[in-house]
UniProtKB/Swiss-Prot annotation:
Ligand binding (NAD(+)): R157, D270, N418
Sequence similarity: Belongs to the malic enzymes family.
InterPro entries: Aminoacid_DH-like_N_sf, Malic_enzyme_CS, Malic_N_dom, Malic_N_dom_sf, Malic_NAD-bd, Malic_OxRdtase, NAD(P)-bd_dom_sf, NAD_malic_enz_proteobac
Catalytic activity reported: (S)-malate + NAD(+) = pyruvate + CO2 + NADH; oxaloacetate + H(+) = pyruvate + CO2
GO annotations of cellular component type: cytosol
GO biological process, any: malate metabolic process
The keyword Oxidoreductase appears for this protein: yes
Species of the source: Pectobacterium atrosepticum (strain SCRI 1043 / ATCC BAA-672)
Gene3D superfamilies per UniProt: Malic enzyme, N-terminal domain, NAD(P)-binding Rossmann-like Domain
Name of the protein described by the UniProt record: NAD-dependent malic enzyme
Length: 565
């Protein structure tokens, strides 16, 4: 159980002068008091005025508004993060709706593509394959000693943009910023990591400014041995850390998750986090439509690790609502670039083979039996839910959506691919094609849709609703693993926060301005599930709630006292 975070207790600091001003976790800038300026040899290094954090945030907000392009805003915010982290999070706290798309999706995708061009200052760890013999030393070199949450990527599948090499570091940095801004996890406890195993992206290899290892990606046994060296080193350095895998390629994501989820407290946000927020959204949407998830039929476009992860969680939820395994699987249809997954298709991946439809059940379908398209699935299976995780734009066509609407009065349509340029259909089109009847959730942010004098808020099915609460719940409860039951608890807690399901109006998911309260609610249910499943010490619900509240970091300056090294 984590100890209370006492914001009133002074920090004893050994640093002084310019060194203190260069330490982003400790720097207060113009907010250092007169006493602190004298004690820490800061006289003459700062303007005369002593400011509050609110005054600093107001100046930063005005400066932010001067930038016209999102990537410029991203670079500006990252610069604040790298100079004064408390101010950075205070600024986010006041403008989260505006700034979340800037620090994370969709703008972070552009930042990853141009990582080597916009690079300013080191953050996190760059662990390269040529330096694999020194991984233990690298972890010792981390600027933060008490690391409790690591987000790691190898940069191979960055959003819908593919292989970005070490440019993928933008994702762990952005993800951990949301762990703090949304989940209250102190930035002193977080560490972004990129595993530099080369890149197969010719644009990166041929870029004279590319800062990563200029080499084709290592693969197979060589790759897995390197990842294992990293995992074992992490276990030696921080044995109780929460490790999140992020944006690994489909061929590696599931094997790595399966290999390490019972060895270290870990999860894969692309597979499990995406599934958890999707399930929460679907439970809420089903309630809003007056049904249960067990009553729905689901069609997927995209049968990669993320899509199949969502599908498996849908099946688990349907089973919890009373369906048998066979009945639940018969209600889920997976379509990829080769068509509907059936038991006749060769060369399926292990996680895909569990989700095939039996050919004999499709015998009376009116379709091309060799490659059954999404449109043919919609005509024959008559899905009530359609989920896009294909990474390809525009594939939810007007014909497909209108065909779905013919047999479903309240279709649930979730084009989840991101960034925005990769979305399967735009919400305004889906609303128009269904005459305002569809319930829509997207993976990227979209403005509300105006249709026939009505305003339709568009829920962003954003993993940020889930993973900060999971992280907070793990830290507060002291859980040593993340179980399927904990993930399902997170989904149900999110559904319970749905304005549309609870009030019959509003958005499918809570407003981002409420995300800290949502994270606390999810953390409580995740912590309870961890205790029930034997991966955390059992305490009372009241004690768990107090641990969550006490561990929820706030961006406020603490007083400093001088000490020696």
């Amino acid at each position: 159980m984590e100890l209370e975070y006492e914001s009133k207790r002074p920090l004893y600091i050994p640093y002084a002068g310019p060194i203190l001003l260069e330490f982003p976790l400790l720097n207060k800038g113009s907010a250092f008091t007169e006493e602190e300026r004298a004690d820490f040899n800061l006289a003459g290094l700062l303007p005369e005025a002593v400011e509050t954090i609110e005054e600093q945030a107001e100046r930063a907000w005005r400066q932010y508004q001067e930038f016209k392009h999102d990537i410029e805003k991203h670079v500006y915010l990252r610069n604040i993060q790298d100079t004064n982290e408390t101010l950075f999070y205070r600024l986010l706290d006041g403008h989260l709706n505006e700034m979340m798309p800037i620090i994370y999706t969709p703008t972070v995708g552009e930042a990853c593509e141009h990582f080597s061009d916009i690079y300013r200052r080191a953050r996190g760890l760059f662990i390269s394959y040529p330096n694999r013999a020194n991984i233990d030393d690298m972890l010792q070199n981390a600027t933060k000693q008490n690391v409790k949450v690591i987000v790691v990527t190898d940069g191979e599948r960055i959003l819908g943009l593919g292989d970005q090499g070490i440019g993928g570091m933008g994702i762990p940095i952005g993800k951990l910023a949301l762990y703090t801004a949304c989940g209250g996890i102190s930035p002193a406890y977080t560490l972004p990591v990129v595993l530099d195993v080369g890149t197969n992206n010719p644009q990166r290899l041929n870029d004279p400014l590319y800062m990563g290892w200029r080499h084709p990606r290592i693969t197979d046994d060589e790759y897995y041995a390197f990842v294992d060296e990293f995992i074992q080193a992490v276990k030696r350095r921080w044995p109780n850390v929460l490790l999140q895998f992020e944006d690994f390629a489909q061929k590696n994501a599931t094997p790595l998750l399966n290999r390490y989820r019972d060895e270290i407290c870990s999860f894969n946000d692309d597979i499990q986090g995406t599934a958890a927020v999707a399930i929460g959204s679907l439970i809420a949407a089903s309630r809003a439509a007056g049904t249960q998830l067990r009553d729905q039929t689901v069609a997927f476009l995209g049968a990669g690790s993320a899509g199949c992860g969502i599908a498996e969680q849908i099946i688990a939820q349907m089973k919890s609502e009373g369906l048998s395994e066979e009945e639940a699987r018969a209600r889920v249809f997976m379509v990829d670039r080769f068509g509907l997954l059936t038991d006749k298709l060769p060369n399926l991946l292990d996680f895909q083979s569990k989700l095939v439809q039996k050919s004999e059940l499709l015998a009376d379908w009116d379709c091309n039996s060799d490659a059954i398209s999404l449109l043919e699935v919609v005509r024959n299976a008559k899905p009530t839910i359609m989920i896009g995780v294909s990474g390809q734009p525009g594939l939810f066509t007007e014909e497909i959506i209108r065909e779905m609407y013919k047999h479903c009065a309240r279709p649930i349509v979730m084009p989840l691919s991101n960034p925005t340029s990769r979305v399967e259909a735009r919400p305004e089109d889906i609303i128009r094609w269904t005459e305002g009847s569809a319930l829509v959730a997207t993976g990227s942010p979209f403005s509300p849709v105006h249709y026939q004098d009505k305003v339709f808020p568009i829920a962003q099915c954003n993993n940020s609703y889930i993973f900060p609460g999971i992280g907070l719940g793990v830290l507060a409860s002291g859980a040593n693993r993340i179980t399927d039951g904990m993930l399902m608890a997170a989904s149900r807690a999110l559904a319970d926060c749905s304005p549309l399901a609870n009030n019959g109006e509003g958005a499918l998911l809570p407003d981002l301005s409420d995300i800290q309260q949502v994270s606390k609610r999810i953390a409580l249910d995740v912590g309870k599930a961890a205790q029930l499943q034997g991966v955390a010490v059992v305490t009372s619900a009241d004690a768990l709630q107090k641990a969550i509240d006490h561990n929820f970091w706030q961006p406020q300056y603490r007083s400093y006292k001088r000490t020696s090294f």
